[in-house]
Design a protein with these regions (language model features):
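Juxtamembrane helix-loop-helix connectors linking adjacent transmembrane helices
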Residues: 105, 127-192, 202-210
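Hydrophobic alpha-helical transmembrane segments
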Residues: 48-55, 101-102, 106, 142-147, ...
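N-terminal, membrane-interfacial amphipathic/helix-forming hydrophobic leader that caps
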Residues: 1-123, 291-334
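Juxtamembrane interface elements at the cytosolic ends of transmembrane helices
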Residues: 114-129, 195, 200
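Membrane-interface helix termini and inter-helical loops of multi-pass transporters
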Residues: 88-90, 129, 162-171, 285-293
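Transmembrane helix-loop-helix hairpins at the membrane interface
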Residues: 180-333
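Hydrophobic alpha-helical transmembrane segments in multi-pass membrane proteins
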Residues: 62, 116, 144-157, 241, ...
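Membrane-helix interfacial "entry" motifs
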Residues: 39-50, 92-101, 133-137, 141, ...
Length: 334
């Protein structure tokens, strides 16, 4: 009996194997938040495309808000509207009723979707990286920021209220609903503003500007201007207050590698102010509108508190070892 031939192993290839191509929608390893969208596939027109999407989203929300706002005003202030000598004069209408506050919160919360969609359609990087350099919301870090900030802002708001003479007024008829919305919906409203004015804006600017510090500085200026003017008041002290807040939020986003710290700062600030205002009957003073006026003392105190809060969060980020750049396990190699 003859033995079967021994199979020969194939000769080794003279061509080296190519490493697997990195996923096309990942940021580069080691990039900080401002540079997350700067990949080999990025193009100069990407920020313009996403800006067009943001603009379309804002126009859509304004139209929707105008229609729903008119219906809410008619429902809540119909007699005042019909009996007014000038139907376009809304000074006597209840702009701070539960339906109007609900509408405002939902429209601003929708900015989260606007920012994510603009990045998803306008840039070659997955939209989940708007949250952070890890491509996700770092919930434990977000909760830690809220816990750290809450005592500070309670002391600030209650102390400022006491120094102002502890003013009180009858609570609104729907104060319970206003209080519930302060805790349930206001966090999403605050997050919506951060995702647009800090998240999308910083990422879009960073696509054009290579140096992170320059990208953050340019974004801080743009964010301070747009964020301040978007609140409606042209009072210089209010504008300065809001601009300082915007700069702090940009700094936190850059130096912590994500939006969580800035969102926590905005959420705690808004929730504490609105909740206290609702309970003491001065909820209308909790919002910034066209008629809101500030003072040097109030602005100085507010800026000082935001500066302390920012320093606390940066310190906590170092202690917690929060990633500031894209980790090896998440990003693509250059």
């Amino acid at each position: 009996m003859s033995t079967p031939p021994v199979p020969h192993s194939p000769a080794p290839s003279s061509f080296p194997l190519r490493p697997p191509a990195p996923p096309l929608d990942l940021p580069l390893i080691g990039h900080g938040y401002p540079a997350l969208l700067r990949t080999p596939r990025a193009r100069r027109w990407n920020p313009l495309a996403s800006f067009g999407l943001v603009l379309a989203g804002l126009v859509g929300l304004l139209v929707l808000g105008g229609v729903l706002g008119a219906l809410a005003l008619i429902a809540t202030s119909g007699p005042a509207l019909l009996g007014a000598a000038d139907p376009t004069d809304v000074t006597d209408l209840d702009l701070y009723s539960a339906p109007m506050v609900l509408l405002n919160n939902l429209l601003l919360a929708a900015l989260i979707g606007v920012a994510l969609l603009a990045v998803a359609l306008g840039h070659p990087v997955a939209a989940r990286f708007v949250h952070s350099v890890e491509g996700r919301v770092r919930w434990r870090w977000l909760a830690r920021c809220v816990v750290v900030l809450t005592p500070l802002f309670l002391a600030y708001v209650l102390g400022a209220w006491a120094l102002d003479g502890a003013p009180t007024a009858p609570r609104a008829q729907d104060w319970v609903w206003l209080l519930v919305m302060a805790f349930v919906l206001t966090p999403f409203q605050a997050a919506g503003e951060e995702y647009l004015f800090r998240g999308w804006l910083l990422l879009a600017v960073g696509t054009w500007i290579r140096r992170p510090v320059v990208a953050a500085a340019v974004t801080a200026v743009l964010s301070a201007a747009t964020f301040s003017l978007a609140h409606g008041s042209l009072d210089p002290w209010i504008l300065l207050d809001l601009a300082a807040f915007a700069v702090a939020a940009v700094l936190l986003t850059w130096r912590t590698g994500g939006l969580e710290a800035a969102v926590a700062l905005h959420v705690v600030n808004n929730v504490v102010i609105i909740a206290v205002g609702t309970l003491v009957g001065t909820v209308e003073d909790s919002y910034v509108g066209a008629e809101t006026a500030g003072s040097p003392a109030a602005t100085l105190l507010s800026v000082a508190v935001v500066a302390v809060a920012t320093a606390l969060l940066l310190w906590q980020a170092r202690r917690a070892g929060i990633a500031r750049t894209v980790p090896v396990t998440v990003g693509a190699r250059p």
